[in-house]
Regions:
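Class I S-adenosyl-L-methionine
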Residues: 7-190
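Conserved Class I SAM-dependent methyltransferase catalytic core
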Residues: 142, 156, 232-321
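General small-molecule cofactor/ligand-binding pocket signal
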Residues: 175, 195-197, 300
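Flexible, glycine-/basic-rich loop-and-beta segments that form/coincide
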Residues: 303-351
């Protein structure tokens, strides 16, 4: 995730905090540690309670979730939302690893998604970081396509949230990165190979061409200023983070990531540089660069309604990449060569 301002929000206090002080008294330190453990225990108890309700098929609302959380001493709405999503991640991972067919596992996760509470609580931080997690059914299919159900595959998620995009894999297979403090703490509880808190809008040379699979749902939004990537200038955050994430994929690796909006074409059939509202979106340069350097298998347009329970109804695209081209060549296909169908049901997405 991003740790510097973007146009969407002028200020985010989470990045301006300092330690209030250091305790040196042993008894005070022990008391603080005990309180911290108690808070963690209460958080886990709430997560387990939500998991139980999800598995029983009970549908909760924002109100019932907050009421249940208050029974465990959890009253902060942001914490309730993130812990609720952690329960969804844990349950979805269990379903993803069931001893059944891919279709059966997928349908169980679709049912889970339909029963989950709408995660529509918003804060200045979540708005600035554009924190809309991936619906579990989409996350499952992206993981299956990337092959992370193979225990020998090593993966990377640079904007991991609470870990939804990793549910097909065992946590030990993944290095995950997240800048949000609440989500970072939730990731630490899941047994990942490594959890980091870095700015994923910057290059990651330590991970260059390191992973069998890269999977990500980067935040959407405009950068404060355009960034040069090779011959193109990128001004959308999700475009930039996707390109940098792809640099960590092995030459024969696979990647799946989500971009905001749908692709539009001009009268000549070329990808339009502006959307229907005449706003510059940078799609033409981005996709030409992507197709020139990578084997792009598909770009699937998804109706925003499928995102409703994640707190938004923003149209998105799932981009599937199968390796790096040995020699850069080609450009994005023209309109008549592309399936522009917008997927609006989970059944159609599976097909």
């Amino acid at each position: 995730m991003l740790d510097k301002p973007i146009i969407l929000d002028p200020c985010n206090p989470v990045f301006n905090s300092e330690e209030a002080g250091i305790f040196t008294d042993f008894e005070v330190t022990q008391t603080i540690q005990s309180i911290g453990k108690l808070v963690i225990d209460h958080s886990l108890q709430y997560v387990q309670a939500i998991e139980k309700r999800l598995k029983e098929g009970q549908k909760d609302s924002k109100t019932t979730s907050q009421k249940l959380a208050s029974q465990f001493g959890i009253t902060n709405q942001s914490e309730v939302k993130e812990l609720t999503e952690l329960a969804i991640v844990r349950t979805a991972r269990e379903y993803a690893h069931a001893n059944s067919s891919v279709l059966e596992r997928y349908l169980s996760i679709v049912n889970l998604y339909k029963n989950q509470v709408r995660l529509n609580h918003r804060t200045s931080e979540s708005i600035m970081l554009q924190q809309y997690s991936t619906p579990a059914p989409i996350a499952f299919l992206m993981g299956i396509w990337c092959g992370i159900d193979d225990p020998n595959k090593q993966g990377f998620e640079p904007s991991a949230g609470n870990g939804l995009l990793t549910i097909v894999a065992a946590p030990r297979q993944f290095i995950v990165n997240e800048i949000s403090e609440l989500r970072y703490k939730n990731l630490l509880t899941q047994g990942f190979k490594l959890v980091t808190k870095n700015d994923a809008s910057l290059k990651m040379p330590a991970y260059e061409r390191s992973f069998d699979a890269v999977i990500s749902n980067p935040p959407f939004g405009l950068l404060p200023q355009r960034v040069n990537v090779g011959p193109i200038r990128v001004h959308k955050l999700d475009h930039l983070m996707a390109l940098y994430a792809l640099e960590t994929m092995k030459p024969a690796g696979k990647a799946a990531f989500i971009l905001g909006g749908h692709t539009h074409y001009n009268a000549q059939g070329l990808i339009a540089g502006r959307n229907r509202g005449n706003h510059a979106v940078g799609d033409r340069f981005f996709f030409n660069y992507l197709h020139h350097h990578y084997n792009v298998v598909d770009v699937i347009s998804i109706d925003g309604e499928l995102y409703a329970r994640q707190g938004t109804q923003f149209d998105v695209r799932v981009v599937l990449v199968d390796g790096v081209k040995k020699e850069p060549s080609g450009f994005a296909p023209i309109a008549e060569e592309v399936n522009q169908t917008v997927v609006d049901t989970f059944e159609a997405l599976y097909e």
